[in-house]
A protein has these predicted regions:
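Conserved acidic residues
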Residues: 64, 114
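Active-site beta-strand termini and strand-to-loop segments that position acidic
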Residues: 110-112
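Polybasic/polar functional segments that serve as interface/processing modules
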Residues: 10-62, 70-108, 122-123, 133-146
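Switch/connector loops and helix/strand junctions flanking conserved nucleotide-binding motifs
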Residues: 126-129
């Protein structure tokens, strides 16, 4: 039986660093694709005031990104949630680990492990002001689609 040696199994620090760098970059690309598909799902159903909070530079966070948006009615909040699910699943095959808030559809949270999605009614979003909880995060506003 022939022994095949893979460079990332060697113990040199340079090789470990390169392997870590490669895997980190791959994870970042996967996360970026996930965030992109989440935004597409929101925009497909006219979700508004999309904000992406990048938490990657903050220690001890529960995830790497928050994607926050709003719908104008409980039914729109539910439809946005379904659209996100479809958009992500078609592109990546991923499903959220959990979805909470469907019962009253005032605030629905979707957990994609590294990315948490929050879909609010405007008054609920204003009350909780979740963006302010992460004021030290890099916040990116995504323009509304008319």
């Amino acid at each position: 039986m022939e022994h095949i040696s893979y460079p990332f199994f060697h113990s040199s620090n340079k090789t470990k660093y390169l392997c870590t760098l490669f895997l980190t970059k791959k994870r970042m690309n996967i996360r970026n694709e996930l965030v992109k598909k989440i935004i597409e799902g929101i925009q497909d159903k006219k979700g508004q005031k999309i904000v992406v909070a990048d938490l990657t530079e903050i220690e001890d966070t529960i995830c790497n990104y928050f994607v926050i948006c709003q719908g104008n009615s409980p039914s729109q909040v539910s439809v946005i949630t379904d659209s996100i699910w479809d958009s992500v699943h078609k592109a990546t095959g991923d499903k959220p680990l959990a979805i909470d808030g469907f019962r009253n559809a005032q605030w629905i949270a979707m957990d994609y492990s590294d990315v948490l999605v929050h879909i609010f009614l405007p008054e609920v979003r204003e009350f909780y002001n979740i963006e302010n909880l992460w004021a030290d995060a890099k916040l990116t506003s995504i323009p509304d689609i008319d």
